[in-house]
Amino acid sequence: MKIRFLGHSGFEIKMKNHTLVFDPYISPNELASHINLSEVQPDFVLLTHGHGDHIADAEQLSKDNDALCISNYEVINWLGAKGVKGHPLNHGGKKEFAFGTAKYVNAIHTSSFPDGTYAGNPGGFVIWDDEICFYHAGDTALTLDMKLIPLTCPKLDFAILPIGDNFTMGYEDAAIAADYIDCPKIIGCHFNTFAPITIDLEKAKEAFKNRGKELILLEIGDSIEI
Ligand code: NI
Ligand code: MN
């Protein structure tokens, strides 16, 4: 499976012949200015919550590529009013799509749209097919609910966790989250985009190493194969 970091919490993930894009925040992000939006071509756009740093390019990417948006009920309604195709989930619900199964799971955070309106409650996604399973946590604090993931989903091969602190859990708590979700391989996100979430990357890697976990930190635009 090929995973490309699009900056902040944004990832492009290829599942067999389907392209999934999570939380696209590319055009407003100066750090991602080398990524051309027209080269990001999702079949599905998955949005963890309504904050601007997660949905900035959702409308354009969905429309330009005739992609299906997957998020909570409120986010899908809000985008639907703008003409975006969508499928709503709510917490604890899962659904089979062409790429595999998506389950919308709990996050401890807030959510509203850039225009200030209610965006429902924030979440994360667990995604799996017959070969691989991963978790994109969205924006969240460390929460005991994460212990439900290994009880209710296939074994995680990797997880994308926020590590930047201030608005989400920091890397110390994220390393504990890696234990809760029983996942050895973590890709960090939601760090170094803005001043309040600037962190020491070596210390972050150390925090995971101390718990026997691997923290992978990608450069914006870079890909890995898992
Ligand atoms: Ni947020
Ligand atoms: Mn955020």
What are these regions (language model features)?
Residues 57-64, 82, 148-149, 173-177, ...:
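A short acidic, amphipathic alpha-helical/loop segment
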Residues 56-113:
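Glycine/small-residue-rich loop that forms an oxyanion/phosphate-binding "nest" at active or ligand-binding sites
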